[in-house]
UniProtKB/Swiss-Prot annotation:
The reaction(s) this protein catalyses: apo-[ACP] + CoA = holo-[ACP] + adenosine 3',5'-bisphosphate + H(+)
EC number: 2.7.8.7
Function: Transfers the 4'-phosphopantetheine moiety from coenzyme A to a Ser of acyl-carrier-protein.
A single Gene Ontology CC term: cytoplasm
Example GO biological process: fatty acid biosynthetic process
Annotated source species: Methylorubrum populi (strain ATCC BAA-705 / NCIMB 13946 / BJ001)
Binding site for Mg(2+): D8, E57
Cofactor entry: Mg(2+)
Name of the molecule in the record: Holo-[acyl-carrier-protein] synthase
Protein location: Cytoplasm
Main enzyme class: transferase
GO molecular function: holo-[acyl-carrier-protein] synthase activity; magnesium ion binding
Amino acid sequence: MILGIGTDLCDIRRIENSLERFGERFTHRVFTDGEREKCDRRAARGPSYARRFAAKEACAKALGTGMSQGVFWRDMEVINAASGQPTLRLTGGAREHLARMVPPGHEARLHVTLTDEPPLAQAFVIIEAVPVAGAS
């Protein structure tokens, strides 16, 4: 069953301006160490950061919290599965809120898609609850 859907459209130029103007103050406030490491290895950092920013916004919308109710930027980390497919790792308030959303006998699955076509980056997040095998 679908528990939440979120989407966000982010102007890459806005993220590039924040990177230029605020530098590490911006990246350390919004992104995890792993996200910063991955983005900073890219020649075009702006689109990479913008996709992740959009994913965090979309996830907060799917959670139904926005950036409130104890959910913070760094509670949501864009990671890649072994296949390269993007997904999200939730910690802190985001993880706690997700746990409250999931009905007994189910587990959460997060589906993420990211894209960019300058000057825009976009993300969709779907939170799904699937039955746990053997749960009654």
